[in-house]
Amino acid sequence: GDVYKRQGVDRDPQAGKVGMASAAGCCHSFTPDGRCITLLKVLLSNACCYDCAYCVNRSSAQTKRATFTPQELAELTVDFYKRNYIEGLFLSSGVIGSPDHTTELMIECLSYLRNELLFNGYVHAKVIPGTDPDLIDAIGRLADRLSVNLELPSSTSLTKLCPHKNAETVTKPMSFIHRLRVSEERQLLEAKNASKGIVKSAGKSKGIVIPTQKQIIKEGLALRSNCLKNTFMRSSRVSSGKRSFSPAGQSTQIIIGASPESDNQILHLSQALYQQFELKRVFFSAYIPVIEDHRLPELDTPVPLRREHRLYQADWLMRYYAFSPDAVSYTHLRAHET
């Protein structure tokens, strides 16, 4: 149960509001009792000024474009919720003009959804790299979870396949989200201690102190395995229900098979993301060849679904059973298995 509750946010029904949220994770996740959580996974717009090689909605693609109005998408979400089609919203968008303008439209949609339609269910929102920090703060107050897609496993591949993106623009919002969550956790803990009459010792740091390896073991926050490493799961001292900014944390997605990186490289990257930004999940997405481009695999290349599955298994071993990337990538993940 606790394994799943760390992935989402609990919010009870409230008088006069529509819906609730259960700490069961993201799109198409399963609860311990086997229940599938369904989210409306939708783009505000498939129009995009970026030209990422692998994307069917890239600016150079000859495809029909459609854009919801913020109010239209909010009303659609509530309508689907009332019909019991969905239990929440997973909102993303192509880049309409600029990251800031696109995020402003997403904020308008979520603000109408929360404040006018009184939707109290789960919301996951994508953050576009390059978005102004103030807008990230604003959308994080409306969404339960934020995610910034890393897209590709190396800066080289990102530069090659996504000419409008680079590693810095992707990791910068991740770092900002992490800092805001840590800051809010510190403030909530200080308020809790103050209400109990607990006074901090002089000279102590006001920041959140990441536990040392010995502290983690002593506090029982980590399982251990034959590789004798700590897991990446730092238990928050503040429940998600008390947070106002991205209470269910942040995640990211990596496309598998569009670029030449090995499973070992991908898992080492995942490890770094968990440790540096305290991500809740790294999602893996098998690349489906649908676009002819000399930078991409041939159209008849098999979709690496088994590889995606094995990476998820390895990710689980790393996060909950303390395996290192090197311990699983060779023994359990045959190189580029398809």
How does the language model describe each region?
Residues 1-47:
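Flexible, acidic/Gly-rich N-terminal and inter-domain linker regions that tether
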Residues 3-7, 331-338:
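Conserved small/polar residues in nucleotide/adenosyl-binding loops
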Residues 41-43, 71-82:
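Short, charged beta->alpha transition segments
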Residues 42-71:
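Canonical Radical SAM [4Fe-4S] cluster-binding loop centered on the CxxxCxxC motif
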Residues 55, 88-91, 146-148, 282:
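Hydrophobic residues within beta-strands of alpha/beta enzymes
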Residues 57-63, 89-99, 123, 158:
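Short acidic, glycine/Ser/Thr-rich loop/turn "cap" segments at secondary-structure junctions
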Residues 74, 97-316, 321:
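Conserved AdoMet/S-adenosylmethionine-binding subsite of the radical SAM
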Residues 80-92:
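Short Fe-S-cluster ligation motifs
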